[in-house]
Amino acid sequence: MNKMSENIKTIENMEYLQGEESMEKAITDNEWKKPIKDLWEMCSDSMVWVYPDFGTEAFLSEIYKQSTTYFDIGREIQVIVDSNNNLFMSVGSPGFVSFANQEDELYGTKEPMRLPIKCWIHTHPNFNAYFSGTDWKTVDSWHGDLESAIVLGKSEIWAYDCATEIGKHIQFIKTSSGRRTVTDGEE
């Protein structure tokens, strides 16, 4: 192996270790959950998952905000709402999220997760909202125990009703206001 190859390998190893340290920190730091839980306490009784209303959109926006702004890099977050209206949350890499190394979120709570799951929400930080092949496999594997699934992306919400297999795609577009100043004599 020449010196250049050795240097590249050393840099790759350092990047890998930094990524591992960064992931460990993301898993152990639970402060990102607080704003989500706080908003949940205010609006949990009125959530409309498949056809999100203003309150639901505000809650979903907070989840997406945490996934893109709280961590060192944009990280996927998943939030599960069980049949008792309890939240179960985990954080992952920019491209994948699971409960690996975060099992306490599922089993270390006062009240364990109860099926069916009302909604499985996860983010695609800084990307479009879409259901990937992995996402569809997750939806299919929970068939009968999952009522709805939502993917949050950059200015987008993709909500899916598992029973009807109907989805709703919402895209937020910032437009100019269209306002102009009315001068004397115009109306």
Residue ranges and their predicted role:
Residues 2-119, 126-187:
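Conserved beta-strand-loop surface patch within small alpha/beta domains used
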